[in-house]
Amino acid sequence: MIEADRLISAGTTLPEDVADRAIRPKLLEEYVGQPQVRSQMEIFIKAAKLRGDALDHLLIFGPPGLGKTTLANIVANEMGVNLRTTSGPVLEKAGDLAAMLTNLEPHDVLFIDEIHRLSPVVEEVLYPAMEDYQLDIMIGEGPAARSIKIDLPPFTLIGATTRAGSLTSPLRDRFGIVQRLEFYQVPDLQYIVSRSARFMGLEMSDDGALEVARRARGTPRIANRLLRRVRDFAEVKHDGTISADIAAQALDMLNVDAEGFDYMDRKLLLAVIDKFFGGPVGLDNLAAAIGEERETIEDVLEPYLIQQGFLQRTPRGRMATVRAWNHFGITPPEMP
């Protein structure tokens, strides 16, 4: 799988991405973009604090790299409580989840990333914990086994997923608040890039930040990653100052084009156009044609291409739009 090698893949977290934690917003007033999410969460958090209650359980979903973990941290900071972090694949046994739940303080936030990957056994334990703040666990084995109930303090579960459709209905229905994160607009990304540049001590023009933002695929994680590579280019090839021209040169060298596409995006679109005459083409055939897994196409490649109007998902398969044909300078076929 080539996803891990892609500079603009938001689905993989590089070691240097961890350094971004220092520049992530800590409070809602610092949170840029997602205006509807921000305004709603501001009300929900204030209401919970006025009542002295734990915030309702929160499900955050959307493409990778849009700030689901950041939003979970902000919620905990705004509520003035601790944040405990884990992920679906890590919670292999019911005891793993029980250990985390019994260590929570009142109103604490438990953040489970990739919550769609919870095992059915762990999920069953989660239901009464979310609904009644109770933990039902089995002690012993065989005929001597017995169930005991443990009362839990009121807490907030925040689940994050890129695949909301993979959640079971019983789990999804137990979240009182559901927020979808959308791709960011270019002006918001420009602000994020400029802010990150200041934190990194870089001299960067507004146009330079705009150039990076335009090619960041609507994703803050990618914007910050591109910024670091542009910084490297500016320091080695120039005097370290990042202008629009320097940013464009650096990103062209990295094969990230003006639409934010890299070689995998272009490979996918060209496969649909050249090998399947623009489509429709089934997902399995497309995955085989470009040597990728269907999950990577669905979760990583497709969302941005569809959102930007380059790819269309139809009942018969994927189709390249006229905009995709024009992007490569190829004349689209006449419509019947």
Swiss-Prot record:
Binding of DNA, residues: R294, R313, R318
Alphabetized InterPro entries for the sequence: AAA+_ATPase (IPR003593), AAA_lid_4 (IPR041445), DNA_helicase_Holl-junc_RuvB (IPR004605), P-loop_NTPase (IPR027417), RuvB-like_N (IPR008824), RuvB_C (IPR008823), WH-like_DNA-bd_sf (IPR036388), WH_DNA-bd_sf (IPR036390)
Record's keyword annotation contains Flavoprotein: no
Enzyme class, first EC level, given as a word: hydrolase
A Pfam family matched in the record: RuvB_C
Residues that bind Mg(2+): T69
Listed transmembrane segments: none
One record GO biological process: DNA repair
Keyword annotations from UniProtKB, A to Z: ATP-binding, Cytoplasm, DNA damage, DNA recombination, DNA repair, DNA-binding, Hydrolase, Nucleotide-binding, SOS response
Head domain (RuvB-H): annotated segments: 258-336
Domain of life (superkingdom): Bacteria
Binding site for ATP: I23, R24, G65, K68, T69, T70, E131, D132, Y133, R174, Y184, R221
Region (Large ATPase domain (RuvB-L)): 4-184
Annotated knockout phenotype: Significantly reduced survival of cells expressing DNA ADP-ribosyl transferase (darT) mutant G49D.
Function: The RuvA-RuvB-RuvC complex processes Holliday junction (HJ) DNA during genetic recombination and DNA repair, while the RuvA-RuvB complex plays an important role in the rescue of blocked DNA replication forks via replication fork reversal (RFR). RuvA specifically binds to HJ cruciform DNA, conferring on it an open structure. The RuvB hexamer acts as an ATP-dependent pump, pulling dsDNA into and through the RuvAB complex. RuvB forms 2 homohexamers on either side of HJ DNA bound by 1 or 2 RuvA tetramers; 4 subunits per hexamer contact DNA at a time. Plays a role in recovery after DNA ADP-ribosylation, probably via replication fork reversal.
This protein's domain notes: Has 3 domains, the large (RuvB-L) and small ATPase (RuvB-S) domains and the C-terminal head (RuvB-H) domain. The head domain binds DNA, while the ATPase domains jointly bind ATP, ADP or are empty depending on the state of the subunit in the translocation cycle. During a single DNA translocation step the structure of each domain remains the same, but their relative positions change.
Family: Belongs to the RuvB family.
Database matches in HAMAP family: DNA_HJ_migration_RuvB
Subunit structure: Homohexamer. Forms an RuvA(8)-RuvB(12)-Holliday junction (HJ) complex. HJ DNA is sandwiched between 2 RuvA tetramers; dsDNA enters through RuvA and exits via RuvB. An RuvB hexamer assembles on each DNA strand where it exits the tetramer. Each RuvB hexamer is contacted by two RuvA subunits (via domain III) on 2 adjacent RuvB subunits; this complex drives branch migration. In the full resolvosome a probable DNA-RuvA(4)-RuvB(12)-RuvC(2) complex forms which resolves the HJ.
Protein name: Holliday junction branch migration complex subunit RuvB
Organism of derivation: Escherichia coli O127:H6 (strain E2348/69 / EPEC)
